[in-house]
């Protein structure tokens, strides 16, 4: 008889829970119930996961303040992502790392600019030397007759009897 009573009691508890859930879900004010349940699940998971992790980290780490700060920042960043924000909380260490990276990149760019400037200066000096060599000789001193093959060409005054030897003559042929 006790077993039947326990069974009836269990069935009554189950029906009571079911009816309570149905009335909660039918209420228009509880339209956000799945979202609230999701947030509570995430918070519970973070709570269960972060406490053992922090205990281990605090035992093994020498600097417990940094570990706690890092864990809290990570939890807040997770909550911000869940809320839909794109911004994140950063620590001073992360900002310093980013600044070091930016400074290193700027130094690399400055070295590149210095190398390019040095090369450009060398090229300008080379062009100046080439220009000076080209301008060293005047064009009057250069004998262009060798270049255009006119050494043996005679002018009109140099021809014998003033006649052009290349002019064609009229000839008649005997048949």
Curated annotation (Swiss-Prot):
The chain crosses the membrane at residues 29-51. Residues 1-28 are lumenal. The N-glycosyl content is primarily Man(9)GlcNAc, with a small amount of Man(8)GlcNAc. Pfam families: Rota_NSP4. Homotetramer. Interacts with the immature particle in the viroplasm. Interacts with host CAV1, early and late in infection. Interacts with host integrin ITGA1/ITGB1 heterodimer. Interacts with host integrin ITGA2/ITGB1 heterodimer. Interaction with microtubules blocks trafficking to the Golgi apparatus. Belongs to the rotavirus NSP4 family. Binds 1 calcium ion per tetramer. This is Non-structural glycoprotein 4. It comes from Rotavirus A (isolate RVA/Equine/United States/FI-23/1981/G14P4[12]).
């Amino acid at each position: 008889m006790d077993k039947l009573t326990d069974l009836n009691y269990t069935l009554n508890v189950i029906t009571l829970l079911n009816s309570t859930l149905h009335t909660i879900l039918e209420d228009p004010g509880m339209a956000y119930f799945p979202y609230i349940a999701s947030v509570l699940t995430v918070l519970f998971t973070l709570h269960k996961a972060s406490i053992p992790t922090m205990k281990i980290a605090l035992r093994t780490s020498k600097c417990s303040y940094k570990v706690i700060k890092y864990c809290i920042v990570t939890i807040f960043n997770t909550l911000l992502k869940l809320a839909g924000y794109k911004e994140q909380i950063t620590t001073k260490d992360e900002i310093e790392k980013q600044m070091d990276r930016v400074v290193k990149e700027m130094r690399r760019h400055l070295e590149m600019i210095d190398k390019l400037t040095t090369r450009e200066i060398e090229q300008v000096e080379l062009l100046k030397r080439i220009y000076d060599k080209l301008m060293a000789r005047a064009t009057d001193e250069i004998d262009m007759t060798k270049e255009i093959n006119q050494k043996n060409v005679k002018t009109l005054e140099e021809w014998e009897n003033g006649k052009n030897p290349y002019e064609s003559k009229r000839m008649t042929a005997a048949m």
